[in-house]
Amino acid sequence: MKPVNSGNNGGGNQNARPAPPELVSWSGCSLKYYRPQGQPEIRTGADPLKPQQWHLKNLGSIEGKRYTRIKAGEDLNVEAAWNSGLNGDGIRVAVVDDGLDMTHPDLRPNIVDGSHNYRRQSLGENRYSNRIAGHKDWPVPCSEDDSHGTSVAGIIAARDYNGIGGTGIAPRASLVGYNLLAFGDERNILDALSRDIDRNHIFNNSWGPEDDGQLNKPASGWTAFNDTLAKGLSKGRNGLGVLYVFSGGNGAWEGDYSSADSATSSRGAISVCATDAAGERAPYSERGSNLTVCAPSGRSTTPASAPEITTPSVKDKYTDDF
């Protein structure tokens, strides 16, 4: 190791070692995350996975792939927004999910201060401590199973023109993560949906109740839940109101109906259903009169008849299965 000149000619330790990296994930997790040193690396270049991202621009085929359900033009038409200068710059999105890989090189340039870790230390037998498991500002995945939030964040705001991966729909938007699903009791649900409503513009919630074909109500009860959303809608963004986006539900195969799934039918909720690359309802996507909009997604059938969505995953990886 090259000696460090301390500037002290009178002696002292001139072989000082750098401080060890700070562990920000919980020691009980299988995935280990350390606080990055310095600023994110500035990369440039075309995004190599972008040609696979049919949801951004659907040409009716993907090189090297054969699909029977793909139709040119069935996409978000997002390039029109980009060409108008609308790329997410100045917009802050809170990804409320199972975790966020804040070190992923395709996400890190867009991560800003304000994330929150809801994970609690387990005491065994379904008992949990009040102590946060890990660092309070680092809602990083605990295992490979906690990759969903990272993939959702990538769809929203993976960085563009950085020479790696693909690109997000709003590639210059700012991201924060709330790993609500790590410990999603009623208090934390209300806290996550009201956290930083003066700074967050959008709360993305790609989660919901069990797909069991039953009527579901919020764990906190309708009054507390609706009051929380009403506060964000009326007082968030300095009175302009925040946007609450919820998944319309993936339980169509189980007979679920989106209107019966708690949050998705609350006043002010933007409920989103899924379409495949041919522009038709994905077979798992729930129907409902509450649905606000449908957007491109995977089809999730075997064998694959339509392409899935390519997006970041944990530990610098990418996936089309999440």
Predicted regions and their residues:
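Glycine-rich, charge-decorated loop segments at or immediately adjacent to ligand/cofactor-binding or catalytic sites
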Residues: F246, G251-S266
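Extracytoplasmic/secreted cell-surface and envelope-processing proteins
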Residues: T103, D212-L215, W253-Y257, E280-P283
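Conserved post-beta-strand hinge residue in the HATPase_c
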Residues: D98, N250, P296
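Active-site core segment of subtilase-fold serine proteases
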Residues: Y33, Q39-A173, L181, E186-T223, ...
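Ser/Thr/Gly/Pro-rich low-complexity, disordered linker/stalk segments of secreted
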Residues: M1-K32
